[in-house]
Regions:
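Well-ordered beta-sheet/strand-loop patches within structured domains
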Residues: 2-222
Length: 222
């Protein structure tokens, strides 16, 4: 029989545990000697490396559709923190370094999230759609992935979009991050936009970047 977590036995301890994990999570980054990307530039860099899109509303989850609209709200808050961000030589992009205070002015809503193997509506749920898109963008650059995590299991069918369904990069504040380091001489930049149906993302650079010879084309390649 699988041993239960302490927070499963005593749910009232969960908020305290989450605060503890987040504190240690960011404390570790403060002293890890990485130079994290925080600079934005209003204008776009001249060289487009790759662009893609992700369908916002998934009607096939089997759960209340309101969670999909809540997810879109959450995505827009998180995207604001990293839109037009520069990833300069020697810098490391961290999803949570940027999105840490995304809900400071406007609160997240409950979105779907995989928790202990079960789909639940949780505060800020749905941000993995953004981390998936980011990971797919990064896969088309020479940026070095230094932290990446897959979901423990896939939860529901994913509709066709510009991001292949096998692309998987989960994030969870205090536990799991998505990080890439720029070990090149080029500066990269992220750009995002929304329309009614899609989240669009692209990555640009300040100079031409050679296309990667070995591109991932299936779930067994990272």
């Amino acid at each position: 029989m699988k041993r239960k977590r302490l927070t499963e036995l005593f749910p009232f301890l969960l908020p305290l545990r989450q605060k503890q994990r987040k504190f240690l999570f960011y404390l570790k980054m403060k002293f890890d000697k990485a130079i994290y990307s925080h600079t934005k530039e209003e204008g776009l860099l001249p060289h487009l490396i790759f662009e893609t899109h992700s369908l916002l509303i998934n009607p096939n989850t089997g759960y209340d559709i309101r969670y999909q609209y809540n997810k879109v709200h959450n995505l827009k808050l998180a995207v604001k923190t990293m839109d037009h961000i520069l990833i300069r030589p020697g810098e490391t992009f961290s999803f949570w370094q940027l999105a840490r205070y995304a809900d400071r002015k406007e609160r997240y809503k409950d979105g779907l999230c995989l928790v202990h193997g079960e789909i639940q509506g949780v505060y800020g749920g749905g941000l993995c759609q953004l981390s998936n898109l980011l990971y797919w963008l990064f896969q088309h650059t020479p940026l070095t992935v230094v932290e990446h995590h897959n979901h423990a299991k896939h939860s529901f069918p994913v509709p066709e979009s510009g991001v292949p369904s096998w692309v998987d990069a989960t994030v969870s504040e205090g536990w799991l991050d998505l990080k890439v380091k720029n070990e090149t001489n080029a500066t990269f930049q992220l750009d995002f936009s929304f329309d009614e149906d899609n989240l669009y993302g692209c990555i640009l650079a300040d100079r031409p970047v050679p296309l990667l010879e070995d591109m991932p084309d299936g779930p067994d390649q990272k």
